[in-house]
Curated annotation (Swiss-Prot):
Catalyzed reactions: GTP + H2O = GDP + phosphate + H(+)
Pfam families: GTP_EFTU, GTP_EFTU_D2, GTP_EFTU_D3
Subunit text: Monomer.
Membrane-traversing stretches: none
EC number: 3.6.5.3
UniProt-annotated location(s): Cytoplasm
Recorded name of the encoding gene: tuf1
Annotated segments matching region G4: 136-139
Protein's recorded name: Elongation factor Tu
Entry's family note: Belongs to the TRAFAC class translation factor GTPase superfamily. Classic translation factor GTPase family. EF-Tu/EF-1A subfamily.
InterPro entries membership: EF-Tu_GTP-bd (IPR041709), EF-Tu_GTPase (IPR050055), EFTu-like_2 (IPR004161), EFTU_2 (IPR033720), G_TR_CS (IPR031157), P-loop_NTPase (IPR027417), Small_GTP-bd (IPR005225), T_Tr_GTP-bd_dom (IPR000795)
Length: 396
């Protein structure tokens, strides 16, 4: 069969498999590619190909992640699978592989286990919008009542972390049966049912271009006779010449007007998500703007100093700290383009944080940053990355 041309006309969605070790995340990933390959929607990736995940660096942290892609009738998917639990933690916190939704894999034989719980909590903290459950290894359970009990347990667990436990689709099957072609009903058919659930239940993410304009400022120049130009890569939205925009963060918020957009020395009418541009600002002095601020659509993002975060602290081997830290730890928090010092408060019951831990913590910055939930940051000491985090809740 001739290979199909990669179609860009389907909506794209990023997903991944999460769940406890040995519950079948990688087998399921392989099974999805195998079943979808029959209709030309994927190229089959065997278990061993996925399991040997290459290492990548994200925000100075090494993570092993396997990427596969496939398509259903409805969408094109990029799917991430990680070999180890630590890789999941790092992946979700750094946002190295953005997840628009996830497939939670739970073994019917074991039911929810500690990492099941931890991955659900992480998904909640880092803002994964929706989950679908695959209850795997159902061929290892003879008693249908037991399957019902496991399903109830999963739903209660999801609800306890503020996911809609009663509504989340739970598909029962066996990834191995699909890989071995042994039992069509719980193998092949269950995988197709799972993908239908993923198509229907995981919402299509808004394209970056359609969101409100935001550009982190990387550099500021003064051009005689023309005014002040700020440069950076537009993170989302569109900026048009003549539009009113805000400069947010570090200093009090000010309004200005975009009087020009320039890319590769050419003048444009507008810049959009993904473009590296220079934006000319009307009546703004060079000293009024600095790296670390953002340009944005008025009112779309606000400056804050206090937030709750989920963070991963690097091990000594990863180039991180050699010793634990305690409440009142004062590192720098690197947001977008700049470092801001902040004070850490650990939650009650957490005495200290060891290298290699992931932890929930509150942070108070010494200067405000344009902030919203899901914003990623690095934790640094004198320019060296010692951790990574994500804003789970803006407090003040």
């Amino acid at each position: 069969m001739a290979k199909e041309k990669f179609e860009r006309n389907k909506p794209h969605c990023n997903i991944g498999t999460i769940g406890h070790v040995d519950h079948g995340k990688t087998s399921l990933t392989a099974a999805i590619t195998k079943v979808l390959a029959e209709t030309g929607g994927a190229t089959y990736s065997a278990y061993d190909q996925i399991d040997k995940a290459p290492e990548e660096k994200a925000r100075g942290i090494t993570i092993s992640t396997a990427h596969v892609e496939y398509q259903t009738e409805a969408r094109h998917y990029a799917h991430v699978d990680c070999p180890g639990h630590a890789d999941y933690v790092k992946n979700m916190i750094t946002g190295a592989a953005q997840m628009d939704g996830a497939i939670l894999v739970v073994s019917a034989a074991d039911g929810p286990m500690p990492q099941t719980r931890e991955h659900i909590l992480l998904a909640r903290q880092v803002g994964v919008p929706a989950l679908v459950v695959f209850m795997n290894k159902v061929d290892q359970v003879d008693d249908p009542e037991l399957l019902e009990l496991v399903e109830m347990e999963i739903r209660e667990l999801l609800s306890s972390y503020d996911f809609p436990g009663d509504d989340i689709p739970i598909v029962k099957g066996s990834a191995l049966a699909a890989l071995e072609d042994s039992n069509k009903e719980i193998g092949h058919d269950a995988i197709l049912e799972l993908m239908k659930a993923v198509d229907a239940y995981i919402p299509q993410p808004e394209r970056p271009k359609n969101l409100p304009f935001l550009m982190p400022i990387e550099d500021v120049f003064s051009i005689s006779g023309r005014g002040t130009v700020v440069t950076g890569r537009i993170e989302r939205g569109v900026v048009k010449v003549g539009e009113e925009i805000e400069i947010v963060g570090i200093k009090p918020t000010v309004k200005t007007t975009c009087t020009g957009v320039e890319m590769f020395r050419k003048l444009l009418d507008q810049g959009e998500a993904g473009d590296n541009v220079g934006v000319l600002l009307r009546g703004t002095k060079r000293e009024d703007v600095e790296r670390g601020q953002v340009l944005c659509a008025p009112g779309s993002i606000t400056p804050h100093t206090e937030f709750e975060a989920e963070a991963y602290i690097l091990t000594k081997e990863e180039g991180g700290r050699h010793t634990p830290f305690f409440t009142n730890y004062r590192p720098q928090f690197y947001f977008r383009t700049t470092d801001v010092t902040g004070v850490v408060t650990l939650p009650e019951g957490t005495e200290m944080v060891m290298p290699g831990d992931n932890v929930k913590m509150n942070v108070t910055l010494i200067a405000p940053i344009a902030m919203e939930e899901k914003l990623r940051f690095a934790i640094r000491e004198g320019g060296r990355t010692v951790g990574a985090g994500v804003v789970s809740k803006v407090l003040k």
